[in-house]
């Protein structure tokens, strides 16, 4: 077991009870690209080359962690999002591909000189991606987690963008001073506590619950708070952008 071909077969065998074949292939590709710095072409052309023992041992260790439920992004400590690289730790949600759609949507409206607020910024992936997309914009991210704020600040430096990240609680905005914004964007907690049973263990066991869940009796808690905040801190022609729970699409619009 000393080539890419052999290691991929090993991963397929070890992880088949937890992941689909396609997911395992994608995970293997991520490891080869992140650790060996191979391209897609390298992976194909060099699949039968003898690998260094240090990488083989590292790969086996990664598979064991994956088998225990740890997400690959936390294992490697980084992930890709919107063409950028982000440090990824259990202090913030793992950036999801579907959130890139939100970034693209907001990016169509964001202009140089605009002030943008990212509520519940987590790793900073939304705000940082938008700051990179429109470098003349003034981007601020807020979160209630000190660890997430520190992670977002590190990611801003990593990606060479100017964005500030502040410890703030949108449910109690009166406890801090705020600017007035042209755009407010948020991917807030929106999964009801009762929906936990439908979620994968690797999400429930490893990602921060305060960034995922809302009470069953108040699923629009954060959307309502942000909408009310916008009444006093959004310019008259300002815009709100959200990632939402599809089960409450119409109710969210009604706010």
Spans of model-derived segments:
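Conserved SAM/SAH cofactor-binding pocket of Class I
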Residues: 98-198, 247
């Amino acid at each position: 077991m000393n080539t890419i071909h052999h290691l991929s077969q090993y991963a397929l065998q070890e992880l088949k009870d937890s992941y689909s074949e396609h997911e395992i292939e994608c995970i293997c590709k991520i490891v080869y690209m992140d650790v060996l710095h191979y391209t897609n072409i390298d992976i194909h052309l060099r699949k039968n080359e003898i690998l260094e023992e240090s990488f083989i041992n590292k790969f086996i260790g990664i598979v064991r962690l994956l088998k225990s439920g740890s997400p690959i992004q936390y294992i490697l400590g980084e992930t890709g999002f919107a063409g950028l690289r982000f440090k990824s730790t259990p202090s913030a949600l793992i950036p999801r591909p579907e959130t890139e759609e939100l970034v693209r949507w907001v990016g169509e409206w964001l202009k140089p000189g605009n002030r943008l607020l990212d509520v519940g910024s987590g790793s900073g992936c939304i705000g940082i991606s938008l700051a990179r997309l429109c470098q003349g914009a003034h981007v601020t991210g807020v979160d209630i987690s000190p660890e997430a704020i520190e992670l977002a600040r590190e990611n801003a430096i990593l990606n060479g963008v100017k964005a500030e990240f502040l410890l703030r609680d949108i449910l109690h905005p009166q406890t801090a001073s705020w600017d007035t914004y042209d755009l407010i964007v948020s991917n807030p907690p929106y999964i009801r506590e009762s929906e936990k049973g439908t979620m994968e263990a690797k999400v429930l066991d490893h990602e921060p619950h305060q960034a995922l869940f809302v009470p069953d009796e108040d699923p629009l808690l954060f959307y309502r708070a942000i909408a009310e905040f916008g009444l006093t801190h959004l310019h008259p022609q300002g815009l709100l952008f959200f990632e939402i729970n599809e089960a409450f699409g119409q109710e969210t619009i009604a706010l």
